[in-house]
Amino acid sequence: MIQELNKTSFKKLILFLLITIGGTLVYFTFTDMPSATASGSVLVDKIEQSDGWGVIAVDPYTFKVYVTNFKSTTVTVVDGTTNKPLSVIEVGKTPYGIGLNTDTKMLYVALEYNDTLAIINTTTGEIIKNIDLVDPYDIAVNSKTNKVYVTSDKTNLVSLVDGSTNEIISTFDVQKPCGIAVNEATNMVYVTSESTNKVHVIEGSKNNLVTTIDVGKSPRGVVANPYTNTVYVTNQLAGTVDVIDGSKNEVIDTISVGNTPRRIVVNPDTNIIYVSNQISNSLSVIDGATNEVIDSIPVEQPFELMINPKTNKIYTTYSGHSILSIVNDVERNQNTLDDSKTIIGMLGAGAIAAIIAFFVIQKKKLKPEQKF
C-alpha cells in the first residue's frame, strides 16, 4: 500500500514539475526578453544659453552637433560625446535653418531675415561663400549628390544649390513651403506646404516636380527613411503623423500623436520615429514596423528636432528659447515584434507536456492490478 502511494505521489510530482517548468519558461519569455515598448530613454542633459537656440544639424561621424542661435549671429558647435559646447562660428544675423553635407563637411545656414544662405567649411570654421536668397527658411542636403534644397515661404520657392559650385541652379514653385527632406536612396525630395495641406514631391535626378500628396491639416515636419522608402509628415493642427509610401506617393496610414506635432526624425537603423509635440511637452516614439506609438518621452517645449542615428541621441529646441535638451534613447530591439510567436510556442510546449503527463498517469490508473 505504501509502495502504491509512493508511486502515485511520484507521478503527481512529475506532473507538477512539468507544469512548473512550462510556466517558468513562459514567465521568463515575458519578463526577460527586451521590450520595444519599455521606456529606456533618459533626458541626459540641458544646455542653456541666452542667445536663443534655433535649428540643429548633426554629423554622425564626428559626433559634432551644430545649432543656430536665432537671436544672435552664431552657430554653436557641441561635442556630442560630452554634451559640452566646443566653439561658435560667426555666420551673420538671424541664423535659423541649417543643413550639413556629411561627406564634404560643408554647413549651410539660412540667415532668415538677412536674405542670405551662408556656406561654412566646418573643418576651418570659415564662411566660404554667401548666396543672396530671399527669406531662406528650411534646408535639406543630399550628401550623395552634393545638392542643397532651401525653402522660402515669402517667395513661394524651393531653391536648388549645387554644392560643387555653390550656385543656385534651379527653383521650384511651391505654395508656402515649410519643411523639407531628402531620401538619399531614391533621390526624391519632399516639401510640406502648411497653407495648402499638401506635400510636394520633387525628383532630384530630373529636377522636376512630379506630384503633390494631400495630407492632414497644417503639415510642417517631414522625414524619409531611406531603408524602407517611407515618408512621415507631421500635421500640426490635426495632432497626427501621415505615413506615405514613397514608391506610390500615397498616404497609407495616419498615426495620432501629441498636441501640436512640429518636427519629426527617424533612426533608419532601428526604424524608430520621433515626433516633437510642443504643447504636450513630449516626444512621441513610433515603431516604423507597426506604425504604432510605443512610448512618450517627457521633454519641455520640444519644437526643432534632430537625431544622431549612431548614438541614438535626440536633440530638441524651442526656437528662440534658451534650452537645448538632449535625450539618450535606448536602442530598441525590433525583433521583439516577432516574439509573440515564441511566447505562443512556449505556452504550447508547456501545455502539451502537462497534458501528456496527465494522460500517462490516467493510463496507469486504468490498468488492472497484476497479482503475483
Q: Positions of the model-derived regions?
A:
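Hydrophobic secretory-pathway targeting helix
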Residues: 2-35
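Polybasic, lysine/arginine-rich low-complexity segments
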Residues: 7, 11-12, 206, 365-367
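Core hydrophobic alpha-helical transmembrane segments of single-pass membrane proteins
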Residues: 18-22, 347-356
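Predominantly soluble domains enriched in secretory-pathway, periplasmic, or organellar proteins
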Residues: 28-338, 372
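Juxtamembrane/start-of-transmembrane alpha-helix segments at the extracytoplasmic/lumenal side
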Residues: 334-348
